[in-house]
Amino acid sequence: MAAPGEALTSSSYITHHLTNLAVGDGGFWTVHIDSLFFSVLTGLAFILVFHSVAKKATSGVPSKLQCFVEMLVEFVDNSVKETFHGRNPLIAPLGLTIFCWIMLMNIMDLIPIDFIPYAAEHALGIPYLKIVPTADVNITMAMALGVFALMLYYSVKVKGLGGFAKELALHPFNHPIMIPFNLLLEVVSLIAKPISLGMRLFGNMFAGEVVFILIAALMPWWAQWLGSVPWAIFHILIITIQAFVFMMLTIVYLAQAHEDNH
Protein backbone atom coordinates (compact mmCIF):
# COMPACT_ATOMS: atom_id res chain seq x y z
CA MET A 1 0.00 0.00 0.00
CA ALA A 2 2.85 2.35 0.77
CA ALA A 3 5.72 2.92 -1.63
CA PRO A 4 8.70 0.54 -1.31
CA GLY A 5 10.82 1.55 1.68
CA GLU A 6 8.12 3.89 2.98
CA ALA A 7 6.45 3.19 6.31
CA LEU A 8 2.70 2.69 6.20
CA THR A 9 0.99 5.43 8.18
CA SER A 10 -2.67 5.90 9.07
CA SER A 11 -2.84 8.77 6.58
CA SER A 12 -1.39 6.76 3.69
CA TYR A 13 -3.63 3.79 4.59
CA ILE A 14 -6.77 5.94 4.47
CA THR A 15 -5.69 7.67 1.25
CA HIS A 16 -4.96 4.31 -0.36
CA HIS A 17 -8.41 2.93 0.44
CA LEU A 18 -10.15 6.06 -0.83
CA THR A 19 -8.39 5.93 -4.22
CA ASN A 20 -10.11 4.32 -7.19
CA LEU A 21 -8.53 2.16 -9.86
CA ALA A 22 -8.91 4.70 -12.65
CA VAL A 23 -8.06 5.24 -16.31
CA GLY A 24 -7.48 8.87 -17.25
CA ASP A 25 -5.74 11.98 -16.02
CA GLY A 26 -8.15 12.70 -13.17
CA GLY A 27 -10.37 14.99 -15.22
CA PHE A 28 -13.98 14.69 -16.34
CA TRP A 29 -13.33 11.72 -18.64
CA THR A 30 -11.57 9.63 -15.99
CA VAL A 31 -13.12 6.15 -15.76
CA HIS A 32 -13.23 4.33 -12.42
CA ILE A 33 -12.66 0.74 -13.52
CA ASP A 34 -13.29 -0.78 -10.09
CA SER A 35 -16.66 0.93 -9.62
CA LEU A 36 -17.80 -0.14 -13.08
CA PHE A 37 -16.60 -3.71 -12.57
CA PHE A 38 -18.33 -4.26 -9.23
CA SER A 39 -21.53 -2.51 -10.31
CA VAL A 40 -21.74 -4.77 -13.38
CA LEU A 41 -20.81 -7.81 -11.26
CA THR A 42 -23.58 -7.16 -8.73
CA GLY A 43 -26.03 -6.47 -11.56
CA LEU A 44 -25.18 -9.81 -13.17
CA ALA A 45 -25.55 -11.55 -9.80
CA PHE A 46 -29.06 -10.08 -9.48
CA ILE A 47 -30.02 -11.21 -12.99
CA LEU A 48 -28.62 -14.73 -12.56
CA VAL A 49 -30.28 -15.32 -9.18
CA PHE A 50 -33.70 -14.08 -10.27
CA HIS A 51 -33.48 -15.91 -13.60
CA SER A 52 -32.56 -19.13 -11.82
CA VAL A 53 -35.42 -18.76 -9.33
CA ALA A 54 -37.93 -17.95 -12.08
CA LYS A 55 -36.76 -20.95 -14.11
CA LYS A 56 -37.05 -23.35 -11.17
CA ALA A 57 -40.21 -21.83 -9.66
CA THR A 58 -42.82 -24.35 -8.65
CA SER A 59 -46.40 -24.17 -7.43
CA GLY A 60 -45.60 -26.93 -4.96
CA VAL A 61 -43.34 -26.59 -1.94
CA PRO A 62 -41.02 -23.69 -2.81
CA SER A 63 -37.35 -23.53 -1.91
CA LYS A 64 -36.10 -21.04 0.68
CA LEU A 65 -34.61 -18.90 -2.07
CA GLN A 66 -37.89 -18.89 -3.99
CA CYS A 67 -39.76 -17.87 -0.83
CA PHE A 68 -37.31 -15.03 -0.25
CA VAL A 69 -37.57 -13.79 -3.85
CA GLU A 70 -41.37 -14.00 -3.80
CA MET A 71 -41.48 -12.00 -0.55
CA LEU A 72 -39.17 -9.40 -2.07
CA VAL A 73 -41.24 -9.12 -5.25
CA GLU A 74 -44.47 -8.83 -3.24
CA PHE A 75 -42.93 -6.15 -1.00
CA VAL A 76 -41.83 -4.02 -3.96
CA ASP A 77 -45.11 -4.59 -5.81
CA ASN A 78 -47.13 -3.41 -2.79
CA SER A 79 -44.88 -0.36 -2.42
CA VAL A 80 -45.48 0.54 -6.07
CA LYS A 81 -49.26 0.06 -5.80
CA GLU A 82 -49.43 2.36 -2.77
CA THR A 83 -47.48 5.14 -4.49
CA PHE A 84 -47.95 4.84 -8.24
CA HIS A 85 -51.55 5.07 -9.44
CA GLY A 86 -50.95 5.22 -13.18
CA ARG A 87 -50.93 2.37 -15.67
CA ASN A 88 -47.38 1.42 -16.52
CA PRO A 89 -46.26 -2.23 -16.25
CA LEU A 90 -42.59 -1.20 -16.21
CA ILE A 91 -42.64 0.67 -12.88
CA ALA A 92 -42.74 -2.38 -10.58
CA PRO A 93 -39.91 -4.24 -12.41
CA LEU A 94 -37.91 -1.01 -12.42
CA GLY A 95 -38.45 -0.56 -8.67
CA LEU A 96 -37.44 -4.17 -8.01
CA THR A 97 -34.30 -3.81 -10.12
CA ILE A 98 -33.27 -0.57 -8.43
CA PHE A 99 -33.85 -1.91 -4.91
CA CYS A 100 -32.03 -5.21 -5.43
CA TRP A 101 -29.15 -3.75 -7.44
CA ILE A 102 -28.45 -0.94 -4.96
CA MET A 103 -28.83 -3.37 -2.07
CA LEU A 104 -26.22 -5.71 -3.56
CA MET A 105 -23.83 -2.83 -4.25
CA ASN A 106 -24.32 -1.56 -0.70
CA ILE A 107 -23.70 -5.01 0.79
CA MET A 108 -20.18 -4.91 -0.64
CA ASP A 109 -19.43 -2.44 2.16
CA LEU A 110 -19.79 -5.26 4.71
CA ILE A 111 -16.84 -7.19 3.25
CA PRO A 112 -13.70 -6.63 5.40
CA ILE A 113 -11.99 -3.49 4.14
CA ASP A 114 -8.63 -5.15 3.27
CA PHE A 115 -9.87 -8.53 2.09
CA ILE A 116 -10.38 -8.04 -1.67
CA PRO A 117 -7.98 -5.07 -2.18
CA TYR A 118 -5.14 -6.99 -0.46
CA ALA A 119 -5.73 -10.07 -2.63
CA ALA A 120 -5.96 -7.94 -5.79
CA GLU A 121 -2.73 -6.10 -4.98
CA HIS A 122 -0.63 -9.14 -4.13
CA ALA A 123 -2.10 -11.63 -6.61
CA LEU A 124 -2.88 -9.38 -9.59
CA GLY A 125 -0.68 -6.34 -8.98
CA ILE A 126 -3.66 -3.96 -8.82
CA PRO A 127 -2.52 -1.02 -6.66
CA TYR A 128 -5.92 0.50 -5.86
CA LEU A 129 -9.35 -1.09 -5.57
CA LYS A 130 -12.62 0.26 -4.15
CA ILE A 131 -15.28 -2.43 -4.07
CA VAL A 132 -18.35 -0.38 -3.06
CA PRO A 133 -19.84 1.16 -6.24
CA THR A 134 -22.37 3.29 -4.35
CA ALA A 135 -19.51 4.99 -2.47
CA ASP A 136 -18.51 6.46 -5.86
CA VAL A 137 -20.43 9.62 -6.77
CA ASN A 138 -20.11 8.77 -10.48
CA ILE A 139 -22.19 5.61 -10.04
CA THR A 140 -24.90 7.14 -7.86
CA MET A 141 -25.25 10.23 -10.05
CA ALA A 142 -25.36 8.08 -13.20
CA MET A 143 -28.28 6.13 -11.72
CA ALA A 144 -29.98 9.36 -10.64
CA LEU A 145 -29.57 10.85 -14.12
CA GLY A 146 -31.12 7.69 -15.56
CA VAL A 147 -34.15 8.25 -13.32
CA PHE A 148 -34.18 11.92 -14.37
CA ALA A 149 -34.24 10.91 -18.05
CA LEU A 150 -37.23 8.64 -17.37
CA MET A 151 -38.98 11.50 -15.56
CA LEU A 152 -38.59 13.79 -18.57
CA TYR A 153 -39.56 11.04 -21.02
CA TYR A 154 -42.81 10.12 -19.24
CA SER A 155 -43.66 13.76 -18.53
CA VAL A 156 -43.57 14.49 -22.26
CA LYS A 157 -45.17 11.18 -23.26
CA VAL A 158 -48.11 11.40 -20.83
CA LYS A 159 -48.76 15.16 -20.88
CA GLY A 160 -47.39 16.06 -24.29
CA LEU A 161 -44.62 18.57 -24.85
CA GLY A 162 -47.07 21.47 -24.60
CA GLY A 163 -48.69 20.12 -21.46
CA PHE A 164 -45.33 19.61 -19.77
CA ALA A 165 -44.20 23.12 -20.74
CA LYS A 166 -47.50 24.53 -19.46
CA GLU A 167 -47.03 22.71 -16.17
CA LEU A 168 -43.60 24.28 -15.74
CA ALA A 169 -44.78 27.76 -16.74
CA LEU A 170 -48.07 27.98 -14.81
CA HIS A 171 -47.24 26.18 -11.57
CA PRO A 172 -47.54 27.14 -8.74
CA PHE A 173 -48.91 30.57 -9.75
CA ASN A 174 -51.44 30.34 -12.58
CA HIS A 175 -50.95 33.83 -14.05
CA PRO A 176 -49.03 34.91 -17.19
CA ILE A 177 -47.09 37.60 -15.33
CA MET A 178 -45.64 34.93 -13.01
CA ILE A 179 -44.33 32.69 -15.81
CA PRO A 180 -40.63 33.71 -15.41
CA PHE A 181 -40.78 33.10 -11.66
CA ASN A 182 -42.64 29.80 -12.14
CA LEU A 183 -40.09 28.60 -14.70
CA LEU A 184 -37.20 29.44 -12.41
CA LEU A 185 -38.84 27.71 -9.46
CA GLU A 186 -39.88 24.59 -11.37
CA VAL A 187 -36.59 24.17 -13.26
CA VAL A 188 -34.59 24.45 -10.03
CA SER A 189 -36.95 21.97 -8.36
CA LEU A 190 -36.65 19.59 -11.32
CA ILE A 191 -32.85 19.69 -11.39
CA ALA A 192 -32.64 19.28 -7.61
CA LYS A 193 -34.39 15.90 -7.75
CA PRO A 194 -31.61 13.86 -9.44
CA ILE A 195 -28.90 15.75 -7.54
CA SER A 196 -30.45 15.00 -4.14
CA LEU A 197 -31.26 11.43 -5.21
CA GLY A 198 -27.69 10.61 -6.21
CA MET A 199 -25.90 12.60 -3.52
CA ARG A 200 -28.00 11.15 -0.68
CA LEU A 201 -27.02 7.60 -1.59
CA PHE A 202 -23.38 8.53 -2.19
CA GLY A 203 -23.06 10.53 1.03
CA ASN A 204 -24.43 7.79 3.26
CA MET A 205 -22.41 4.99 1.68
CA PHE A 206 -19.19 7.01 1.48
CA ALA A 207 -19.53 7.97 5.15
CA GLY A 208 -20.06 4.33 6.09
CA GLU A 209 -16.99 3.27 4.13
CA VAL A 210 -14.88 5.98 5.77
CA VAL A 211 -15.92 4.79 9.25
CA PHE A 212 -14.78 1.23 8.44
CA ILE A 213 -11.48 2.58 7.08
CA LEU A 214 -10.92 4.71 10.20
CA ILE A 215 -11.59 1.73 12.46
CA ALA A 216 -9.05 -0.35 10.52
CA ALA A 217 -6.49 2.47 10.37
CA LEU A 218 -6.63 3.80 13.92
CA MET A 219 -7.33 0.73 16.06
CA PRO A 220 -4.97 -2.22 16.69
CA TRP A 221 -5.92 -5.39 14.82
CA TRP A 222 -6.95 -7.25 17.98
CA ALA A 223 -9.41 -4.49 18.97
CA GLN A 224 -10.90 -3.68 15.57
CA TRP A 225 -13.86 -6.01 16.08
CA LEU A 226 -14.98 -3.84 19.02
CA GLY A 227 -15.71 -1.03 16.59
CA SER A 228 -16.32 -2.83 13.31
CA VAL A 229 -18.92 -5.39 14.48
CA PRO A 230 -21.34 -2.89 16.11
CA TRP A 231 -20.91 -0.51 13.17
CA ALA A 232 -21.50 -3.33 10.67
CA ILE A 233 -24.73 -4.30 12.45
CA PHE A 234 -25.91 -0.68 12.37
CA HIS A 235 -24.71 -0.32 8.78
CA ILE A 236 -26.98 -3.18 7.67
CA LEU A 237 -29.89 -0.91 8.56
CA ILE A 238 -28.34 1.98 6.64
CA ILE A 239 -27.70 0.04 3.43
CA THR A 240 -31.26 -1.35 3.46
CA ILE A 241 -32.85 2.04 4.11
CA GLN A 242 -30.79 3.74 1.39
CA ALA A 243 -31.80 1.15 -1.21
CA PHE A 244 -35.45 1.52 -0.18
CA VAL A 245 -35.33 5.34 -0.20
CA PHE A 246 -33.78 5.44 -3.68
CA MET A 247 -36.44 3.04 -4.98
CA MET A 248 -39.35 4.91 -3.36
CA LEU A 249 -38.19 8.33 -4.56
CA THR A 250 -37.83 6.92 -8.07
CA ILE A 251 -41.42 5.65 -7.93
CA VAL A 252 -42.66 8.99 -6.52
CA TYR A 253 -40.89 10.99 -9.24
CA LEU A 254 -42.26 8.75 -11.98
CA ALA A 255 -45.74 8.94 -10.43
CA GLN A 256 -45.51 12.74 -10.63
CA ALA A 257 -44.46 12.45 -14.26
CA HIS A 258 -47.63 10.45 -14.99
CA GLU A 259 -49.96 12.92 -13.27
CA ASP A 260 -51.54 15.98 -14.85
CA ASN A 261 -50.93 18.01 -11.69
CA HIS A 262 -48.40 17.57 -8.90
Curated annotation (Swiss-Prot):
Entry keyword set: ATP synthesis, Cell inner membrane, Cell membrane, CF(0), Hydrogen ion transport, Ion transport, Membrane, Transmembrane, Transmembrane helix, Transport
Keyword NADP: no
Biological process annotations from GO: proton motive force-driven plasma membrane ATP synthesis
Compartments where located: Cell inner membrane
Transmembrane region(s): 30-50, 91-111, 131-151, 201-221, 232-252
Membrane topology summary: Multi-pass membrane protein
GO MF annotation: an example: proton-transporting ATP synthase activity, rotational mechanism
A Pfam match: ATP-synt_A
Chief localization: membrane
Matching InterPro entries: ATP_syn_F0_a_bact/chloroplast (IPR045082), ATP_synth_F0_asu (IPR000568), ATP_synth_F0_asu_AS (IPR023011), F0_ATP_A_sf (IPR035908)
GO cellular component labels: plasma membrane; proton-transporting ATP synthase complex
Subunit structure: F-type ATPases have 2 components, CF(1) - the catalytic core - and CF(0) - the membrane proton channel. CF(1) has five subunits: alpha(3), beta(3), gamma(1), delta(1), epsilon(1). CF(0) has three main subunits: a(1), b(2) and c(9-12). The alpha and beta chains form an alternating ring which encloses part of the gamma chain. CF(1) is attached to CF(0) by a central stalk formed by the gamma and epsilon chains, while a peripheral stalk is formed by the delta and b chains.
PANTHER family tied to this protein: ATP SYNTHASE SUBUNIT A, CHLOROPLASTIC
Main function: Key component of the proton channel; it plays a direct role in the translocation of protons across the membrane.
Family of the protein in this entry: Belongs to the ATPase A chain family.
Protein name per Swiss-Prot or TrEMBL: ATP synthase subunit a 1
Lineage: Bacteria, Pseudomonadati, Pseudomonadota, Gammaproteobacteria, Vibrionales
Gene: atpB1
